[in-house]
Amino acid sequence: MRTRFILSFIAALFMQFATVSADSYTDGIMKLMNNDAMASFNTKAFEQMSQIPSVNSGYLTGQFKTDAVEWLAGHYRKNMSEKDFGDMISFFMQPEVLAIQKKVLSAAASSQGQDAMQSLMPQMQALMTGGTPEDLKEPSCDPQLKKEILRWLEINNSAESVKASMNCAKGLVADMAPEGVSADQMEMMAKMMDGMFSFMEKNMNTLILTALAGKVDLKDMQTLNAIEKKPFFASYKKANASLVGDMSTFLDKVVAGMRK
């Protein structure tokens, strides 16, 4: 349950936004992020987080949204021209791209995504008993589809994003612990989570392949990866790298806001 909460936390951080001071950048981000697929996924993710007694859900449904939009807009504003940014938004707002996005989010929330997380249980048991978990086995997947999924992850700096998010999620460990937990127990929990995060970082591609296999097809991933051929791609990559590089600082602020 704790691991599923953390992944929901990571997935939801940039997906639901409120009204902020408008310009073409903030307007574009809100247009991109407030589609039906995102809204449905966010509702479930925030419901999970609000069940944690020590989490300040008021921050997540209030100031966080403004902070997130302004943070994202700032990086795009700094690294992309208005034309490039507008073209990027148009690419992601294409009906076929939105439909694929819905498939990806559905995979994360579906039984298939839960099965991917359930596959971690033996590894968690090994970590709890001081053992070394075995790496996950990749699912059966068309080689070309696998190549396109891995390329999609690379384009979006997914490994770096997940690493930064996991490091910040560690800051919630103490808040999530039940009352009466001793210092020794907390230390053991922290070590176990360190081990789990390291394991998940190493096996993240396999986890994502497991969740997406059967949910997306080759054409879906080729449609997403067509972004590489767009004139705005170079500035998009620059903005994306800037976001990832600053993510730890932003998530530290989010974690602080989430604490009651």
Description of each model-found segment:
Residues S8-Q16:
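Bacterial N-terminal signal peptides
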